[in-house]
A protein has these predicted regions:
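Short Ser/Thr-interspersed hydrophobic loop/turn segments at strand-loop and sheet-helix junctions
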Residues: 49, 73-77, 170, 186-191, ...
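A short, Trp-centered hydrophobic/proline-enriched beta-strand micro-motif
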Residues: 117-125
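Short glycine/proline-enriched turns and hinge-like loops at secondary-structure junctions
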Residues: 64-65, 133-135, 159-164, 177-180, ...
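Flexible, small-/acidic-enriched active-site or ligand-binding loops
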Residues: 136, 189-220
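A short core secondary-structure module
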Residues: 147, 151-195
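Conserved hydrophobic/aromatic beta-strand scaffold that supports enzyme active sites
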Residues: 122, 138-140, 147, 165-169, ...
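Short Gly/Pro-enriched turn/cap motifs at secondary-structure boundaries
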Residues: 114, 129-132, 156-159, 173-175, ...
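Alpha-helical interface subdomain recognition
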Residues: 1-89, 101-106, 113-118, 131-134, ...
Length: 379
């Protein structure tokens, strides 16, 4: 059992730490304030090979493993969780299911678009009445000759109004429940595709979230991803992998908050000494550091298992649950150390705290993670 990162993974961390410090950190506050999609930085991440980094080299990707991807998301999210979210969604929720379930023709067409072609990807599962209970989805896909016709809508879609390629789930046979759900690769240029409401969110203001609407949307038959009726299984497998990305994002948020709080408390003098010298402050930081190390081990373990082709459902759920709750707790305690200043926008803690909350909700709430974990330990 080797807990040391390989040289390649160390280089990935170094590259992303430098990029985050030089490119992401300087615009993070403005990105949050204006709710602007960080387009220039995403283009730079395409050029660095981070977008679609786990795509095999023969399709234009870097051929990296899930651990490398998690490290990238962790580093980005230390300064801008929105950027980490955009990357995590593109890599884990769009590229990954095409890599895993796509035909050779689908991979040859879409994976180069999602890497060298600088096309952004998204994932369409959630509906207004189908959140945690994904099987309640009402979006329908009816086969009509050489194409499917999709009707319905999806909500809370990350990358929604900037993405070009979407992995979409729809009912092809409502009588079969989860076995009647199928997956499709849908382009934003397809007839009948449109973007609806742009969501105004509590946090992740730089992450473009929107409603996606299908009105007699024409999808070529060859864009069926996997087999008819296998969509629910594809969705659940994809979310397993996506949870590693959210765990890494949450871990990064927590680490960023801890760094900000440590720097502040070393310089903030009260009662004749820096508040970092008070034992209660030190104990709080000790707990933060301990939880970060535990979260990192859980996240990296899940990523390594995924990379080895082993079952990782339980481990991914544990990592996502632990790290998201760690992020919320750490940002709350870090903000408290800033006192009144922490409640202002002069410091990044209030943004980090707002960003942290969603990690307990999306890609499976904390409650759903506990359901997954309990179901995988023999209960």
């Amino acid at each position: 059992m080797d807990f040391n990162l390989s040289r390649e993974h160390q280089l990935v961390r170094k590259m992303m730490a430098e990029f985050t410090e030089n490119e992401v950190k300087p615009i993070a506050a403005e990105t949050d304030k204006t709710s602007q999609y960080p387009r220039e930085n995403i283009e730079k991440l395409f050029n660095l090979g981070v977008m679609g980094m786990c795509v095999p080299k023969e399709y234009g990707g870097a051929g990296a493993d899930p651990l490398a991807s998690a490290i990238c998301i962790e580093e980005l999210s230390m300064q801008c969780a929105s950027t980490g979210d955009i990357v995590a969604t593109h890599n884990g929720l769009c590229c990954d299911p095409i890599i895993t379930h796509g035909t050779e023709a689908q991979k040859a067409k879409y994976l180069p678009m999602l890497t060298k072609g600088h096309k952004v990807g998204a994932f369409c599962l959630t509906e207004s009445d189908a959140g945690s209970d994904a099987a309640k989805g009402q979006t329908e896909a009816k086969l009509d000759g050489d194409h499917y016709v999709l009707n319905g809508s999806k909500i809370f879609i990350t990358n929604g109004y900037v993405a070009d390629v979407f992995v979409v789930f729809a009912m092809t046979d409502k009588s079969k429940g989860t076995r009647g759900i199928s997956a499709f690769i849908v382009e934003s240029s397809f007839p009948g595709f449109s973007v609806g409401k742009h969501e105004e969110k509590m946090g992740l203001h730089g992450s473009p979230t929107a409603e996606i609407v299908f009105t007699d949307c024409i999808v070529p038959k060859e864009n069926l991803l996997g087999q008819e009726g296998k969509g629910f299984k594809i969705a659940m497998q994809t979310l397993d992998g996506g949870r590693i990305g959210i765990a890494a994002q949450a871990l990064g948020i927590a680490e960023g908050a801890m760094e900000e709080a440590m720097a502040y408390t070393k310089g903030r003098v009260q009662f004749g000494k820096p508040i970092s010298k008070f034992q209660n402050t030190q104990f709080t930081f000790a707990d933060m550091a301990m939880r970060s190390e535990a979260g990192r081990l859980l996240t990296y373990q899940a990523a390594v298992l995924k990379g080895e082709g082993k079952r990782f459902t339980k481990e991914a759920a544990m990592a996502k649950l632990f790290c998201s709750e760690h992020a919320m707790l750490t940002t709350t305690k870090a903000l408290q150390m800033f006192g009144g200043y922490g409640y202002t926008k002069d410091y990044p803690l209030e943004r980090m705290m707002r960003d942290a909350k969603i990690t307990e909700i999306y890609e499976g709430t904390s409650e759903i993670q506990r359901v997954v974990i309990s179901g995988n330990i023999g209960l």
